[in-house]
């Protein structure tokens, strides 16, 4: 079945093409750290031949605690993204939380992301669609894979068909997430074979019901990423940090930056193998 291709500049994103890495840090902690992390990602992905898009948030508007670090904000965040693009020649993805942010962010970055908690907010969807930018839609933890077709339809009605879908797990009881590997195929089907990517980092979150921040299971990041990529996906969404224990957001789920090359070597091998197979139709 023909898979839809979304172009991010010269990077082609599709379920049957070599996977694209959307990788970086959870939130911009400082200009210098962003430069360090981006440089390492660029070095490793160029060595391994993996198409790469840098990711980070300029504002984490949905932190559990009012006292948690949110980021540098819109103005400073866009300056950092511009410097990363100019210095390393990378594409950039970041999330927006309000309709008023959509165009200013789209003027700087290459992909704008619709957060999971906001994915059904029609005003925000319409504002993002109007920018004409490539869109990454995070599947809400509380929405089934089959419902994602409705969100894609909203973007199409808004005149934007450059849509990527991203799964980050589903609620499993209270304070836990699981990833349904069958859901990836459902999301492809209901969206007209839009590219589907896997956010392995946030799928590893495990909340403390009485805590002010999310916990995580980064010790299982490799096995979960390998399982997801074995389905045959357009990309992987990954967060890393040189010192996860002291990261300002989601450190417990972040891959240690020093392990990036070893990790991606395994992921690329699985992606290459899976996409070397002929498509097998078992419905007919």
Curated annotation (Swiss-Prot):
- GO term, biological process aspect, one: keto-3-deoxy-D-manno-octulosonic acid biosynthetic process
Major localization class: cytoplasm
Q: Does the keyword Transcription regulation apply?
A: no
Give the matching Gene3D superfamilies.
Answer: Aldolase class I
Keywords carried by this UniProt record: Cytoplasm, Lipopolysaccharide biosynthesis, Transferase
- EC assignment: the record states 2.5.1.55
Protein name per its UniProtKB record: 2-dehydro-3-deoxyphosphooctonate aldolase
Gene source species: Salmonella arizonae (strain ATCC BAA-731 / CDC346-86 / RSK2980)
Taxonomic placement: Bacteria, Pseudomonadati, Pseudomonadota, Gammaproteobacteria, Enterobacterales
Per the record, the gene is kdsA
């Amino acid at each position: 079945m023909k898979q839809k291709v979304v172009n991010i500049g010269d990077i082609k994103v599709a379920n049957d093409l070599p996977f694209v890495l959307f990788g970086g840090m959870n939130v911009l902690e400082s200009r210098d750290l962003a430069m360090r992390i981006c440089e390492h990602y660029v070095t490793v992905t160029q060595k391994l031949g993996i198409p790469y898009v840098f990711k980070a948030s300029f504002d984490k508007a949905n932190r559990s605690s009012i006292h948690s670090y949110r980021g540098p904000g819109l103005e400073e965040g866009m300056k950092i993204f511009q410097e990363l693009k100019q210095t390393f020649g990378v594409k950039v993805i970041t999330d927006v939380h309000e309709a008023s942010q959509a165009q200013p962010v789209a003027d700087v970055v290459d992909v704008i992301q619709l957060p999971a908690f906001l994915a059904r907010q029609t005003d925000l969807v319409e504002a993002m669609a109007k920018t004409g930018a490539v869109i990454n839609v995070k599947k809400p933890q509380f929405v089934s894979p089959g419902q994602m077709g409705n969100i894609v339809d909203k973007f199409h009605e808004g005149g934007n068909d450059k849509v990527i879908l991203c799964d980050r797990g589903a609620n499993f009881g209270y304070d836990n997430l699981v990833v349904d590997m069958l859901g990836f195929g459902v999301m492809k089907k209901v969206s007209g074979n839009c590219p589907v990517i896997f956010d392995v980092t946030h799928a590893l979150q495990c909340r403390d019901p009485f805590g002010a921040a999310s916990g995580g299971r980064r010790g299982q990041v490799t096995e979960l990423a390998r399982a997801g990529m074995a389905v045959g996906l357009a990309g992987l969404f990954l967060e890393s940090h040189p010192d996860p224990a002291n990261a300002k957001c989601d450190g417990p789920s972040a891959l240690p930056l020093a392990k990036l090359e070893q990790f991606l070597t395994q992921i690329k091998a699985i992606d290459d193998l899976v996409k070397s197979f002929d498509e097998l139709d078992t419905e007919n």
